[in-house]
Amino acid sequence: VDPYWMIPHFEKMLYDNAQLLGVYAQAAVATGEPLFRRVTAETAEWLLRDLRSPEGGFYSTLDADSEGHEGKFYVWTPDEVRDLLDVEQYEPFAQRFGLDRDANFEGQWHLHTFKSIADIATDLRLDEATVETRIDEARARLLEVRNQRVWPGRDEKILTSWNGMTIGGLARASRALERDDLAGAAVQAMHFLRARCWKDGRLLAVHTDGESRFPAYLDDYAMLAWGLLELLEARWDADALAWAVELVDVMLEHFTDHEAGGFYFTADDHESLILRPKTFSDDATPAGNGVAARVLIRLGYLLGETRYIDAAEATLRAAHAAIERYPHGHGTLLMALEEFTSPPWILVLRGESDELDVWRSEVDKLYDPHRMIVAVPSDAKNLPAALASKKALGGAVAYVCRGMTCSPPVPTLAQLVRELRGQ
């Protein structure tokens, strides 16, 4: 990018957008800012429209180039846009996105936000709602025309770890936007990975050209497990919980460094390497050890499994020196450390599905990144003991837990909201 963050590298990556989807969804809930809500919705729509395979998995990238030129798919000229729009649409659009200024990318215009809606409304003597409507109509028209251009190449590898992040991002967006279809897309991606990338109790890392291959790495197990936990917060799914447990147990059995703590990048039965790598720092994606620790903490407290908490502690102890030396590079492990030292709130709702939907919707409006919420229908079967012990008592009830200690059941939504606001 340039110093002004105006011109991007035009390649679009699944892992970037999956993470941003979750971040904007959280920001929308935390702030109530309409812009964040809009970006969440538009990012989700883009993922579903441009990167989802017919079977429900998600492809890896859209290239930067088309027809041999970087960014050609995305740039415009004022004359092109003027020919496509009504006069009343063009003027606010041009001011908003710089078509009334000099070209900003190789003699053409990459659409960049230059002027606020409020300033445009003042300049054109219109109300802000009218300006927004006209700009939205213009964007829709340009998207329609852009889709008729020669598309950038698409890398149609489906990577397990990146799809795990996408499941998590879609689940968060589902909650923030109250759109169950996004949770449905996350479930479909889960089913795709289970059908195509899970064989004999182990994950495969890549699906491409109709085949799945390569033994999965730590990141695949950890990020998919994290995505499944996020999905459980958006929609009760017994299969998601059971698979998360399976993934974590494989991770503990085959990736653990039993001497120093933490997890190796490769399994103990992976092809022999001169050195088995074990990394703690974040890169373009979160560190596998950091994600694993966060999964172990949350799943451990949800299910009352102290061995998961112990494994998370061993990981944090193993990473301590690296975190202390360069904390900025270990954000994921720092988030895990925060939840290890101050356990997350685990909120278990029990009752009929329709009533649970109302309770969860209200609770989701109370932003708390350190709270995990699971709404378990009263007719759910074969529950783990820690969830089965939390009974549905006629109507909906809530169990508020911190660490391994839970409150008596909270019998009304109003009381629950009061208690959560007081935390």
Question: Across the structure, where does each feature detected by a protein language model lie?
Answer:
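Glycan-recognition and catalytic cores of secretory/periplasmic carbohydrate-active enzymes
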Residues: V1-Q423
